Amino acid sequence: MSSDTGPATTATPALAVEELVAGYGGVIALDRVSISAGTAAITAVLGANGAGKTTLLRAVSGMIRPRRGRVLLDGTDLAGRNPEQMVRAGIAHVPEGQAVIPELTVEENLRIGMMSWPRGRSRADRSAALDEAFERFAPLAARRRKLAAALSGGERQMLVIARALLAQPRVLLLDEPSLGLAPRVMAQVMDLVVRLSREHGITIILVEQNARGALAIADHGVVLNLGRVVAAADAATLAADVALRHHYLGF
């Protein structure tokens, strides 16, 4: 395993996590974790169950408060802010589990994504943003007034990503977006992730159990084990490291 164990870095990282320590009660789930993600790049965060991947996203998004360390967005330290403040700063989080509100329609679910907008934004701005969301996620347009409970797993995943994008983030945190999806739908979701990065300039932190698929689309990768970074490099280097793959990634 020859991969560099320092953080995957770029010349101008949009998001940098420095020496982050976080946990639950007396359990330390992240131990001095440092990573960075370049503007409009995809950074895959990989590792076995319990490695600390989801905790990392929760700490970055404000769902849990780090015990130590910094979360820098364009150089500004946001560590310790709550989720609403993180969204307003430009970080949106899509947790695993396709967490739609089933009793609301597709459009009503999407409107929740605009709750962080300043009060001065006009109704026309909101309508235009919704139209853009339905154009970008065409399968949702035909179900605009259907209850979210009626959507398939793939459509629900599209909905939660579309809702997060309506907050107009610079950084998008995706936790297991392919979980439970059929291979064809999973490929569509991965293609969407690439387009968000390449065409819309969004910096993406992608947590995935499907390490092979994540490295295939990522620019950089970080491997966690027991709350620590054990490898970080460009995605091609990690994918080519046979010992690393077998030991930590399962392929």
Located regions from the model:
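ABC-type ATPase nucleotide-binding domains, specifically the catalytic core motifs of the NBD
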Residues: 25, 43, 81, 106-128, ...
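Helix-to-loop junction immediately C-terminal to a conserved catalytic motif
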Residues: 61
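ABC ATPase C-loop
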Residues: 164-165
